[in-house]
C-alpha cells in the first residue's frame, strides 16, 4: 500500500482550514496509507487554534509547523516536502475543496516514470461577472491541459509528486510560480508530468474585478519572474492550441469570454 503525505501551506485561513482538513480525512483513502498531514502555517489569525482543536478531536497524525512571522509559500512548500515521510506528497491549497476521490486520483497516476500528477481545478459556479471570467479562463486552461503538456499543466491548487524527487528540489525564496518551477525541475530530471481530469478540486472564483485582475497579474508576474531568473521553461503551449481552444471555449461560453474583457 502506497504511503502518502498530505501537505497544506496556510496563511490566515481560519475560514477554510477546517473544511480542507475534513475534506482530506473523510475522502476516499481505502487503497492508500495516509501517514500524516503536514500544515506549514504563517498565520496571525485563529488558524493555529482551529488546527490544534481539530488535532484533539481526530486521530489522524497531523504535524503543525507554525512560524511566528510570514515566510511565504516557497518556505511552506519546502517545509512540507522536507518533513514528509510518505512515498508520495499531495499538496493542497488551504482554501480548496477536493472531491472525495481527488487524493486517490492524484496518487494513482504516480509511478516509476511519472513524477508529478496535476489536478483539475474547477471554480464553484457563480453568476457574478468576475466569477464568470474566472470560470472561462479555467475552462480554457482545462481544455489546453487535455491537448498537450505546457507551462499551464501543473497548477498549485492541488498536485501530487513523488517524495524522492521532491526532496531533491529547493524552491527559491519569494518565488511566485512555484508550480511551474517544480514542473520544469521534474521534467529536467527526465520524469513525466501528467494531467488527470478526474482529480477535481473545487475553489471559489473571484468575487470582484480587483480580485480577478490581481489573479491574472500575479500569474503574469510569476512567469516573468522565472524569465528574469533565466530559468528555462520546457514545453511552451503552442499558439495553435491556445487559439483553437480559446475559440472552442468561447463558442460554448461567450458570456464568460466577454467577462474577461470587462
Regions found by a protein language model. Give the residues of each.
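Catalytic donor/gating beta->alpha subdomain of glycosyltransferases that bind UDP-sugars
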Residues: 110, 116-138, 172-240
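Glycine-rich, basic loop-to-helix element that forms the pyrophosphate-binding segment
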Residues: 67-84, 181
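Short aromatic/hydrophobic "clamp" motif used to bind/position activated sugar donors
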Residues: 89
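Short, acidic, metal-binding catalytic loop of nucleotide-sugar glycosyltransferases
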Residues: 22-34
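Cell-envelope/extracellular polymer assembly enzymes that use nucleotide-activated donors
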Residues: 3-5, 36, 181
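Long helical/loop segments within the catalytic core of UDP-sugar-dependent glycosyltransferases
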Residues: 65, 72-75, 106-167, 213, ...
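Acidic donor-binding/catalytic loop of UDP-sugar-dependent glycosyltransferases
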Residues: 46, 94-108
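A conserved acidic beta->alpha catalytic loop
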Residues: 23, 40-49, 69, 96
